[in-house]
UniProtKB/Swiss-Prot annotation:
Cellular component annotations (GO), alphabetically ordered: plasma membrane
HAMAP family hit by this protein: HemeA_synth_type2 (MF_01665)
UniProt xrefs under InterPro entries: COX15/CtaA_fam, HemA_synt_rhodobact, HemeA_Synthase_type2
Predominant cellular place of this UniProt entry's protein: membrane
Places the protein is found: Cell membrane
The protein's name: Heme A synthase
Reactions catalysed, as given in the entry: Fe(II)-heme o + 2 A + H2O = Fe(II)-heme a + 2 AH2
Enzyme Commission number: 1.17.99.9
Record function comment: Catalyzes the conversion of heme O to heme A by two successive hydroxylations of the methyl group at C8. The first hydroxylation forms heme I, the second hydroxylation results in an unstable dihydroxymethyl group, which spontaneously dehydrates, resulting in the formyl group of heme A.
Membrane topology, as annotated: Multi-pass membrane protein
Cofactor(s) required for function per UniProt: heme b
Species whose genome carries this gene: Ruegeria sp. (strain TM1040)
Keywords carried by this UniProt record: Cell membrane, Heme biosynthesis, Iron, Membrane, Metal-binding, Oxidoreductase, Transmembrane, Transmembrane helix
Chain spans, region Disordered: 1-28
Amino acid sequence: MSNRTIFEEVSSDSKQQSSPTPGGIDRKRRGARGAIRVWLAVLFALVVAMIAVGGLTRLTDSGLSITEWRPVTGAVPPMSEAEWQAEFEKYKQIDQYHLMNTWMELSDFKTIYWWEWGHRQLGRVIGLIWALGFFGFLVTRSIPTGWTGRLLLPGILGGVQGAIGWWMVASGVTLGEGMTSVASYRLATHLGLAFVILGFLAWYMFLLGREERDLMQARRLKEEKLFGMSTGLLHFAFLQILLGALVAGIDAGRSYTDWPLMGGQIFPPRPFMIEPLWKNFFENPGLVQFIHRVAGYLLFAFAVVVWLRGRRSAHKATQFAFNAVFAALSLQLVIGIVTVMTAAPVEIAIVHQAVAVLVWVLILRARFLSAYPVATSIKGH
């Protein structure tokens, strides 16, 4: 049995025969594809914004400013000076304040509080828009056949993401344990799931952008080898995104600022200084940055191989998609080097993360077109 990947189209719809005289409900569902696609596009844009705001929240060390998890009542921020002072007093009970921010006044605390509150509030908005859209389409029976489960999935994953977000924050809301930030592996889990959700939304948008009949015909032209290679590239890119989260989680991007060497050496000094040994792969800044660097080189090398194969596609749109992937990855490699050599300032680090989103979506697009080519070849037939 062939392996299935997280974004592979496995719909049973392709097995259905189109009715010669579709009924009113079928026509209604077919017509709703555009509306559902717009709804997904709104969710997609909000998730991209969520990733950006989450990145800025981490880079500004704002993520621990709200020490409680109140999914509903937390939507209302402090409204009076007394309420603000109460929130500040809660923050003063955790290690981050005692070890990093004893200099803070209430006005300084408000700045980091708003970042974290905005991040959580955006999550609530995403959940609300998903629920309104999903149940609205469900009640009006506008969801195309076979799509109910698919459209339910982002909502379920969003709920899980909220729980993971608090699990992540809870790792840093400590006293006496020396934690000044969230656990890096929990941060990687949180960011990784955000990219998974974004991937599903993008894939569904690609599918709904074409008629079911067109997809059925296009699948007969599927480029199996290119599809498999792009799937591998997608998974490799996902791994690199997780490694990037580990780097951000422990500020490893600032540990060595020379390139191509690290501290004047190929391998960073004291790579296994933490006990037990396995913790170095998650908590040793030098080793974590080294792994992220090497993975980046390997990802780029593999991308070149995939790109060269993609250029041989018989379809112009597929060729263009793989050209775009190669261009975006080339840009990302350069930005990554600049990020290291400038000690990861916030403005460059957030651009690095934003381009990672671009690379992710472009790889998905190229993978989609290798599975469902647009039936116009480079020879014009």
